[in-house]
Amino acid sequence: MSTRTESNISESGLDEGLVLVLNCGSSSIKFALYDAAEHPLPKRPMWSGKAVDIGGPNVTYEDTDTPCGPLRTEDDGRRPYVAAIDYIRARVRKRVGQRRLIGVAHRVVHGGPKYSHPVRMDAEVLADLKSYIPLAPLHQPYALEAIAALMEGVPDLPQVACFDTSFHYTMPKVEKQLGLPHEVWDKGLRRYGFHGLSYEYMALSLPELYGDISKGKVIVAHLGSGASLCAMEDLKSQSTTMGFSVLDGLMMGTRPGTLDPGAILFLMESE
């Protein structure tokens, strides 16, 4: 499929083709294809898959139509992550067939203090998001690498970044402020909150399951290797356990959670 075909957008809008969703981690890429022509929009993808152990010796690939097996790409100097994105794009192209791929949506962990809603990607936005890499060094670089690779490979294909931090913009300022001098707020030090896309999905799903009672005061848990809690009222975030970084809050698989700064100072002085 040519670049022009991949990036074709119908004159009637973005509701007649397919949308690819990417969730890029440090060594894995999960992807799903949704039919934008379905109304209401489907909660389950028409096709999905993942590539795992990218950059490692045993990188594997699987999708709805393909059992798990080694992912083999040409050794042509491309970075492993870019090679994996190109491989997935080729598989998507084959799966799309005569349909139109009208856009790509990316999970991006950190939108910083600037981005409170999904945003169409361009060079300026990409530069902004790169500046937030220090705030999420284990997550942010890989989503941006995928975005940059697609910008280069299919420059006319619309890409949209959806942020894990956006859902928590509704928190009162008193919840966002840290116990530090006020001037650090202007430096971006504040409680951002994460797992927002997961919580947004729950906010959309709860009324279907429980009706109007779900619009009251509700505590929602995102539990996995990374974990957090979110307090909602009227289906909007009011408080969350994660703060400035994804290390805060609950104790997790490889993250300490809330930690007394005095403990760190003690270890620095005694070890």
Language-model features and meaning:
Residues 106, 137-140, 158-163, 219-221, ...:
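General beta-strand structural signal in soluble alpha/beta enzymes
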Residues 55-102, 146-148:
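Conserved active-site "lid/cap" helical segment
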Residues 19-21, 28-78:
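Short glycine-rich, Thr/Ser-proximal phosphate-binding strand/loop in the N-terminal lobe
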